[in-house]
C-alpha cells in the first residue's frame, strides 16, 4: 500500500523525499496523489514483491497516469545499459536496480567455502532466467525467488498453504537465516529477478556501473544510427 500521509509529511518536513513501489498504474496514481515524490514502477520480472504486469507495459502506463506529479523510476528486468536505455525510452526518469548487484564482489552475505564467491552467489551464477518462481512463501505476498529445494518443497502436493502477510515471514524467518549460512547452493532461498540469467560472473560494483554506462551509450548510438539511415 501507500505510505501513511502523516509519515510522508514528517519526511518532507525533514527534507527527505519519499519513494514507493507500484505494480500497477492504479497504485502509482494513489502514491502520487498523497504526495509520494518518486514512484518505482516495478514490473513482473523483478525480484521480491511484484505485481503481474511486465515492465514494458507497466512503465509507460505509470508515466502517463502519474504525469508530472512524481518522478518515475523503472524496476524489474534491468541489468544492462541497453535495458536502462529502454526504460528511459518508455518515459522513466531513471532506473531502480537490485538483483544485478547480488553478484558484486562487494556482496558479503552467506557462507563461503573456499574464500571465493558466497554460496548464495554460486547459486545465482548457476541460474538461468527460467530459474525463478513467483510465490507467497517468502512473506505471504507474491514475491519472485530463486528456484531451489526450498521452493520445490512448498510446491509439493502435501505442502501447506502460505500464511497471510506478515505471519508467513514470522513462520519462515528462522529457516531463511539457517539457509543463508548453508554450504549447499541448492537450498538458497533468495529473492532475485529474472535478470539472474545474465548475472554470470563476480565483478566489482565499479565494473558493473561502467558497463551500464558503456552499454547505455552503445544502445543510444545504435538508435541514432537507425534514425540517420
What do these predicted ranges mean?
Residues 1-73, 80-99:
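Alpha/beta enzyme core
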Amino acid at each position: 500500500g501507500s505510505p501513511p500521509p502523516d509519515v510522508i509529511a514528517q519526511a518532507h518536513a525533514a527534507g527527505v523525499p519519499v519513494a514507493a513501489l507500484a505494480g500497477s498504474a492504479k497504485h502509482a496514481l494513489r502514491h502520487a496523489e498523497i504526495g509520494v515524490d518518486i514512484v518505482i514502477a516495478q514490473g513482473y520480472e523483478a525480484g521480491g514483491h511484484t505485481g503481474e504486469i511486465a515492465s514494458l507495459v507497466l512503465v509507460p502506463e505509470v508515466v502517463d497516469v502519474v504525469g508530472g506529479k512524481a518522478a518515475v523510476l523503472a524496476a524489474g528486468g534491468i541489468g544492462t545499459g541497453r535495458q536502462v536505455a529502454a526504460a528511459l525510452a518508455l518515459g522513466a526518469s531513471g532506473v531502480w536496480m537490485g538483483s544485478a548487484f547480488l553478484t558484486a564482489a562487494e556482496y558479503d552475505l552467506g557462507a563461503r567455502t573456499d574464500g571465493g564467491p558466497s554460496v548464495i552467489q554460486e547459486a545465482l551464477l548457476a541460474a538461468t532466467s527460467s530459474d525463478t518462481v513467483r510465490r507467497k512463501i517468502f512473506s505471504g505476498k507474491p514475491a519472485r525467488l530463486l528456484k531451489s529445494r526450498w521452493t520445490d518443497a512448498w510446491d509439493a502436493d502435501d505442502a501447506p498453504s502460505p500464511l497471510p502477510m506478515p505471519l508467513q515471514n514470522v513462520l519462515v524467518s528462522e529457516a531463511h537465516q539457517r539457509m543463508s549460512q548453508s554450504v549447499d547452493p541448492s537450498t538458497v532461498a533468495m529473492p532475485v529477478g529474472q535478470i539472474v540469467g545474465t548475472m554470470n560472473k563476480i565483478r566489482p560494483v565499479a565494473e558493473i556501473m561502467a558497463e551500464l554506462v558503456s552499454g547505455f551509450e552503445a544502445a543510444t548510438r545504435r538508435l541514432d544510427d537507425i534514425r540517420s539511415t
